[in-house]
Swiss-Prot record:
The gene is Obp1f. Keywords: Disulfide bond, Olfaction, Secreted, Sensory transduction, Signal, Transport. It is found in: Secreted. This is Odorant-binding protein. It comes from Rattus norvegicus (Rat). Disulfide bonds join C60-C64, C79-C170.
Length: 172
């Protein structure tokens, strides 16, 4: 019970950093790719890790009260396609189940870039990551700086930042 309460407290603190941004279908619906991911626990997002998600497509349902994400994960060099549907809650966070329970929200958005923060909780503990999805292959210098800043705000070491485009052989 104490572990559960600590996880709930940690989730509340991690989500208090930023106001959750609303998104609309016109901003989201379409093909996306994962550009960068940075995590406090690199093991889950390393090559072959269950949270190293190579986005393919995102789509809003019910005015973005649901967010469907289609992505690939490479396990044993084989691409596996997964679909999750995040349900939006009053606080603006989405929740879904994949490799544990996930609580995610939009940190920042432009026409072709969306920064997400995700907290993943499973039987082995809690980990958090920032993921950048885009409609192009890289971030500009200011956006890379923004990713570093966001990682620092969530106490995620910047040296854990990984550029996923070079390793994304699933979406070619």
């Amino acid at each position: 019970m104490v572990k559960f309460l600590l996880i709930v407290l940690a989730l509340g603190v991690s989500c208090a950093h930023h106001e959750n941004l609303d998104i609309s279908p016109s901003e989201v619906n379409g093909d996306w790719r994962t550009l960068y991911i940075v995590a406090d626990n690199v093991e889950k997002v390393a090559e072959g890790g269950s949270l190293r998600a190579y986005f393919q497509h995102m789509e809003c349902g019910d005015e973005c009260q649901e967010l469907k994400i289609i992505f690939n994960v490479k396990l044993d060099s084989e691409c596996q396609t997964h679909t999750v549907v995040g349900q939006k809650h009053e606080d603006g966070r989405y929740t879904t189940d994949y490799s544990g329970r996930n609580y995610f929200h939009v940190l920042k958005k432009t026409d072709d870039i969306i920064f997400f923060h995700n907290v993943n909780v499973d039987e082995s503990g809690r980990r958090q990551c920032d993921l950048v999805a885009g409609k192009r292959e890289d971030l500009n210098k200011a956006q890379k700086q923004e990713l570093r800043k966001l990682a620092e705000e969530y106490n995620i070491p910047n040296e854990n930042t990984q550029h996923l485009v070079p390793t994304d052989t699933c979406n070619q």
